[in-house]
């Protein structure tokens, strides 16, 4: 994950990430006594929901600053900094849960293999992340605005089709029990700065490719390009498309 994370901005203006994750927790249905790994736990906003039925929840995230915030806000949970592609924790887990994380990691096959190693036979892998076409208007504008200013920028995100990701899971040893791709237009918090806040929170790689003294010009052009599609009723919206899945590890 190449983004530089700001825990305060994340919790203050992008809590919708965790709020939408509540229905994913219901789908995962952690049970009393189960061992659950929250893969990409961030600031820990879903830890209590995952443990509410009596499961023992461990968190893992690639950002030290996010994990520090989670440890301070949610004492009593085992939380670790680690790489989703190659983590090693005391196994096995009954459930690996992940929300809004996997699109940050293009090496999807490595993640799937790591998850499979961490699960017991019959263990569940339940997740949601950006799917094919996610934030297309925003991404296209970020790239176009950069090109117009003479900068060659690249998207850091992995937004696969259902077919592509189902294949990844199958090869890693999973039986896929659910795979959905759906639109979720999401209202951003601030009616004026909502899109800029989103780019500052999630689009750090784009901003890193533009000189800081030109950020304002760059972001203004991104807003200009997206306004006809993503600004309505006085608010900015992100054109999210989500890939939601459930899978079970096949017995060895």
Residue ranges and their predicted role:
Residues 177-233:
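C-terminal helical/coil "lid" or tail adjacent to the Rossmann-like core of SAM-dependent
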């Amino acid at each position: 994950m190449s983004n530089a994370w700001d825990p305060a901005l994340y919790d203050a203006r992008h809590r919708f990430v965790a709020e939408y994750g509540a229905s994913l927790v219901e789908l995962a249905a952690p049970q009393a006594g189960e061992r659950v790994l929250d893969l990409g736990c961030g600031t820990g906003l879903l830890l209590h929901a995952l443990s509410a039925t009596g499961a023992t929840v461990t968190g893992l995230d690639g950002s030290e600053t996010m994990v520090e915030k989670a440890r301070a806000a949610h004492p009593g949970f085992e939380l670790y900094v680690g790489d989703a592609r190659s983590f090693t924790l005391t196994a096995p887990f009954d459930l690996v849960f992940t929300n809004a994380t996997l699109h940050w990691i293009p090496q999807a096959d490595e993640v799937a293999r790591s998850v499979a190693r961490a699960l017991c036979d019959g263990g569940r892998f339940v997740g949601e992340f950006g799917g094919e076409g996610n934030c297309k208007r925003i991404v296209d504008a970020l790239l176009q605005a950069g090109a117009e200013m003479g900068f060659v920028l690249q998207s850091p995100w992995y937004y696969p089709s259902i077919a592509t990701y189902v294949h990844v899971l199958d090869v890693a040893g999973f039986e896929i029990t659910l795979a959905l791709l759906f639109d979720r237009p999401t209202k951003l918090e601030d009616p004026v700065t909502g899109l800029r806040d989103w780019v500052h929170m999630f689009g750090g790689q784009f901003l890193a490719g533009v000189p800081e003294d030109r950020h304002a010009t760059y972001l203004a052009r991104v807003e200009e390009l997206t306004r006809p599609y993503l600004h309505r009723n006085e608010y900015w919206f992100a054109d999210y498309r989500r890939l939601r899945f459930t899978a079970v590890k096949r017995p060895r």
